[in-house]
UniProtKB/Swiss-Prot annotation:
Membrane topology (UniProt): Peripheral membrane protein
Induction remarks: Down-regulated by retinoids.
Organism: Rattus norvegicus
Chief location of this protein within or outside the cell: secreted
Listed name of the protein: Fibroblast growth factor-binding protein 1
Tissue and organ distribution: Expressed in gut, eye, thymus, skin, lung, tongue, Purkinje cells and cerebral chorioid plexus (at protein level).
Alphabetized InterPro entries for the sequence: FGF1-bd
Taxonomic lineage of the native organism: Eukaryota, Metazoa, Chordata, Craniata, Vertebrata
Entry GO MF terms: fibroblast growth factor binding; growth factor binding
Length: 238
């Protein structure tokens, strides 16, 4: 009887130890899971902040085009897409233009760094920038799947240089002198006179007689040569 009680007591102690071990493990796992859940949003926020800093630092810059225009560019966000403004100086002239597009869909896939690098490279390759109304800034990373990411010029070149009063007066004088230019009389031009004379000579009786005589005596191959000599000898008006 005593042995039976000892066995039962030892069994109860073992069961209590197993239960306490399970409770301790459960208590350890709960704080770990909450810590991971708390850390994941903070890591996501940190990554988003870093990405936004990278994007902002790459959405403006300076460049020199192939035709030696010194320019700077900057991006502003709009309700639908973005505007990329370009301001340039070349040969003491200042001009600017704006390119517009919507690369939002492409930039969602962590392609912002590559996209802006390719935009900057495309700007440097431009020639006569802001002068062509069909200019488009394309990137390899986005242009196929996201054609709306191509930036198209929305307002062609805007000049800032103003015309001086002296140059303005010269232009006005040139315009006022235009009506006083000598007009050429087309009806009395040499070409018109020759054309009229040729048509009259074709119907002249003397010329017809000369051509007929030359054809009879000289043959078809020499008729023009003979007609020339007959014309010299007879001294017709034609």
């Amino acid at each position: 009887m005593r042995i039976h009680g000892l066995i039962l007591l030892s069994f109860l102690l073992l069961a209590a130890q197993v239960l306490s071990e399970k409770v301790r493990k459960t208590a350890k796992n709960v704080p770990d899971s909450t810590t991971e859940e708390d850390m994941s949003p903070s890591l996501g926020k940190a990554r988003n902040k870093q990405r936004s800093r990278t994007s902002k630092s790459m959405t403006h810059g300076r460049f020199v085009t192939k035709d030696q225009a010194t320019c700077r560019w900057a991006v502003t966000e709009e309700e639908l897409g973005i505007n990329l403004k370009v301001q340039c100086t070349r040969a003491d002239q200042e001009f600017s233009c704006v390119f517009a597009g919507d690369p939002t869909g492409c930039l969602k896939y962590d392609k912002d760094q590559t996209y802006w690098k390719q935009v900057a490279r495309t700007l440097r390759k431009q020639k006569n920038i802001c002068e062509n109304s069909k200019s488009v800034l394309k990137t390899r990373v986005c242009r196929k799947k996201f054609p709306e990411s191509n930036l198209k010029v929305v307002n062609p070149r805007k000049e800032k240089a103003e015309v001086s009063p002296r140059e303005h007066n010269k232009v006005q004088e040139a315009v006022s002198m235009e009506p006083n230019k000598v007009k050429v009389d087309i009806t009395t031009s040499p070409a018109a006179t020759v054309a009229v004379k040729d048509s009259e000579c074709l119907e002249d009786p003397d010329v017809l007689t000369q051509r007929k005589t030359a054809l009879e005596f000289c043959g078809e191959s020499w008729s023009s040569f003979c007609t020339f000599f007959l014309n010299m000898l007879q001294a017709t008006s034609c």
